């Protein structure tokens, strides 16, 4: 597993006091090492401070800065950390605003700033020159020869590839980090001195998030703090670490002490994102020049205290407000897709089987919303409840009551007589409760629904969800089949929240009460006889495992192409204290086996809308052979 801990630091500084700044930088490095940080980024011109202005022309300051870099190289010997500090660099009688990458006693490379702000409160071109066209130069310092200098430098250790840009470089139309990322950098370091203005922090944060998303990279950002000169502007010491569009860590600005934020970067995840992205591959032709890769080697990037947050419910936003917003958007996608199918076919009726369970409830809610949107009467929604051998009073009554309060055309067809006749026809003992016993019921229900759809001139709406498709937890040509499937890319963990959203925000008290009870009912196909007290005996999660685990496994398998070992590691972190390691391993093995062996069902799926980033449609997201072996994946 390729995880690496990184940090962004803002030391206390004094303007033009190099010795003081050096001491504080060392303190930050030592603290970062204690925290197992392997890459640490300091602000722009952190050795001298950013706001020295015309003092940058003073040879004394430049000499002190050079000596401080040498001091840091000596200080770094034997320390397994790469850190980037900002300082002036004089080359061919020209001064550059530069980043120095220091590791184990050496300057690995010097990266000049490409774009110099020179308007309003900024006038860097008074002192510095742009390094935009400098690539692959070899320079030297008094204490070290053969140092790479240029904007095309990539610093690589194993699968970790690091690129550097400086402050304004991020704010231009095509930042250098775009080309560095296309060339393979998965970690971008930005040494910055971005002054604070009202709402500028929000804009800056969005820039960093968007750039890390666009580059499918991590982004370590460090900006100068409040101890810079305040003659005309104020700096806030904004520190951010982003990964592929999300913020992993961010500080509270305006701190008056040395500060470090840290985060764990998932290198494998970034690699997987790029591997699947065809446009990223195609975009590589735009790289304007050859990159110069500088190889170095971390001794050990293992993390003893792995404290990276792993979301146990990756399909469900943890923030309630965001969750509600997402729920509304999902319903809009489902209803708009279904509306298009009705408009295309010209059909005016829907047929749907209602069991009193979660999936059929969500599907019915989608159909009702669609009919309301199309201004079609709810009486044209033909809802069929089909009690069988395992139907309980609880689910039966919830199905009846829900349809009643929603105002649909409710019908009831008991499948027991037809199933008994079918058992007799095929010579299957009624008391033999095996897969045939179960599938006869599922197929009988589908046959009824299909034939009624023909009779009514309606569209049969499928109710199965993404989690069931992943596990193959459906009867082939039974509940597996429909004319249009509205839940096909909604995982079970998300189904619950969608139903809950309607119960909380869009229901009468009567309907809300029914929905809450449905949410509280154990998930079951109810294909086996109920117990002597009339309760459900066939509980899906007792048979195939907890859906929250399977949804977690599915997300990481499909989203990032994660190996079984990686999924297991992440699951044990995410569900620590919820499930024992042995339980996670058991259900992961079950998931992997079922995911492969049940592909034949997914190869024959009806149409249905893709809602999130993960779908199992054989026409789009998962083109997988039905006879692939899972042995190599266990």
Language-model-derived ranges and their functions:
Residues 1-353, 369-378:
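Enzyme catalytic cores with a strong preference for nitrogen-chemistry domains
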Residues 5, 21, 158, 215-217, ...:
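ATP/NTP-dependent adenylation/nucleotidyl-transfer catalytic domains that generate, transfer
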